[in-house]
Amino acid sequence: MDQLMNFSLTSPIFLLLSSLFLIILLNKLMRGNKIQKGKKLPPGPKKIAIIGNLPSNGRFTSLIVFLNNLAEKYGPIMHLRIGQLSAVIISSAEKAKEILNTHGVRVADRPQTTVAKIMLYNSLGVTFAPYGDYLKQLRQIYAMELLSPKTVKSFWTIMDDELSTMITSIKSEVGQPMILHDKMMTYLYAMLCRATVGSVCNGRETLIMAAKETSALSASIRIEDLFPSVKILPVISGLKSKLTNLLKELDIVLEDIISAREKKLLSQPQQPLMLDEEDMLGVLLKYKNGKGNDTKFRVTNNDIKAIVFELILAGTLSSAAIVEWCMSELMKNPELLKKAQDEVRQVLKGKKTISGSDVGKLEYVKMVVKESVRLHPPAPLLFPRECREEFEIDGMTIPKKSWVIINYWAIGRDPKIWPNADKFEPERFSNNNIDFYGSNFELIPFGAGRRVCPGILFGTTNVELLLAAFLFHFDWELPGGMKPEELDMNELFGAGCIRENPLCLIPSISTVVEGN
């Protein structure tokens, strides 16, 4: 019987028949997905086949060039059909503002992807939760408690502690080529685990492993999400099994963390909280027990687990990518590197190290970060919105359930907005108040409107702190005698906009700082 089962599931005949069945089924679904008569959709190419015209080599530039070429032909509002997916691509700041402001409620939902449904406990996190009362209340908790300015300030001690560990690690390897990304990820995972669930976390390795795996599985548009009515697709592809097994490991750790904290609170109800216990988990447990600021709003264990995991997931890869691009651009432009280092070392003159409290004083560092996310946004295509109802814009119909995707990469390099759009010029932000908090639509790398990222302050504080620490403590050079103009700046589209080849640099301890 075992041999028969193994043969039936793995034999070439079974795989061939399954593939033929799948192709026939998907093509039938694509043919059957008709456009309503009398509706004028935004212009766009004909329906794209299952693989079709989309670039398949995984290169970021291939996908972006493909979309930008289409936008030049069809305009800033463009319609694509990919499988069962109806997608509207927005490629201008003006139209992004109209969509996200004027029609904000209509596009306030998120598509329910396979990864989010499983790994976020049926999309309970703030990123993918359906628009409604739950999401509104959750965003308020983020703004007022979880990631408020006061809370972020309270995390400075944790940031400083983990940053010191990272700096010590780099100092032990001076003179040797190192991958900067690896050092940053170690810092970010350690800092985020402490900020979310406290210093005592026996399952930290599992949390990190699950975050890495989930990021990898979310790195591209998946065929399972292009044909949502074919429920068997995630099973055939093996995605459902992989995610389910991953969630089991993650869930055990998160349940243990919650249980341990609840037992401690019950056994010592009157004892003041330690610093690391004034974390995000502590805030969420208040809402589980009806002791939050809004006593009517309650969360379950699944809510807490989804929120905690999402916070760890969202705060690592994007932050590391931003700093890596900042350092890449500065190494490519030595005069800008000197200017940034001079500012940091002048502001911190007389100090031996940098702290979270220092980043607010570093104006040029902030400009470097803004310019970096303009050119190399952490999400070149912003998280898709899903239309809650049909509506019209410029006489064109945006269908219900269609995905609305903001092509921020195109906006960030639009020559109508940005002079010398392809050139790295932090000074362009010196005489204006443009920020990336969602009100300036020419700079929305973290989204805008009702689904703007609630963790911008926390994320940018970490980014600015990491970048300033690298500039303050170390001098840097490219390996192998490489010249600045020889440094490749190739981008790769995956879970975000990352370097195709990780940035490798050689650090040396700054004699200016050490001599203070």
UniProtKB/Swiss-Prot annotation:
<dbReference type="InterPro" id="IPR001128">
    <property type="entry name" value="Cyt_P450"/>
</dbReference>
<dbReference type="InterPro" id="IPR017972">
    <property type="entry name" value="Cyt_P450_CS"/>
</dbReference>
<keyword id="KW-0349">Heme</keyword>
<dbReference type="GO" id="GO:0009709">
    <property type="term" value="P:terpenoid indole alkaloid biosynthetic process"/>
</dbReference>
<dbReference type="GO" id="GO:0005506">
    <property type="term" value="F:iron ion binding"/>
</dbReference>
<dbReference type="Pfam" id="PF00067">
    <property type="entry name" value="p450"/>
</dbReference>
<keyword id="KW-0503">Monooxygenase</keyword>
<keyword id="KW-0479">Metal-binding</keyword>
<comment type="similarity">
    <text>Belongs to the cytochrome P450 family.</text>
</comment>
<dbReference type="InterPro" id="IPR052306">
    <property type="entry name" value="CYP450_71D"/>
</dbReference>
<dbReference type="InterPro" id="IPR002401">
    <property type="entry name" value="Cyt_P450_E_grp-I"/>
</dbReference>
<keyword id="KW-0472">Membrane</keyword>
<dbReference type="InterPro" id="IPR036396">
    <property type="entry name" value="Cyt_P450_sf"/>
</dbReference>
<feature type="transmembrane region" description="Helical">
    <location>
        <begin position="6"/>
        <end position="26"/>
    </location>
</feature>
<keyword id="KW-0560">Oxidoreductase</keyword>
<keyword id="KW-1133">Transmembrane helix</keyword>
<keyword id="KW-0256">Endoplasmic reticulum</keyword>
<dbReference type="GO" id="GO:0020037">
    <property type="term" value="F:heme binding"/>
</dbReference>
<protein>
    <recommendedName>
        <fullName>Alstonine synthase</fullName>
        <ecNumber>1.14.14.-</ecNumber>
    </recommendedName>
</protein>
<keyword id="KW-0812">Transmembrane</keyword>
<dbReference type="GO" id="GO:0016712">
    <property type="term" value="F:oxidoreductase activity, acting on paired donors, with incorporation or reduction of molecular oxygen, reduced flavin or flavoprotein as one donor, and incorporation of one atom of oxygen"/>
</dbReference>
<comment type="pathway">
    <text>Alkaloid biosynthesis.</text>
</comment>
<feature type="binding site" description="axial binding residue">
    <location>
        <position position="453"/>
    </location>
    <ligand>
        <name>heme</name>
    </ligand>
</feature>
<keyword id="KW-0408">Iron</keyword>
<comment type="function">
    <text>Involved in monoterpene indole alkaloids (MIAs) biosynthesis. Converts by aromatization the tetrahydro-beta-carboline alkaloids tetrahydroalstonine and ajmalicine to the corresponding beta-carboline alkaloids alstonine and serpentine, respectively.</text>
</comment>
<dbReference type="GO" id="GO:0005789">
    <property type="term" value="C:endoplasmic reticulum membrane"/>
</dbReference>
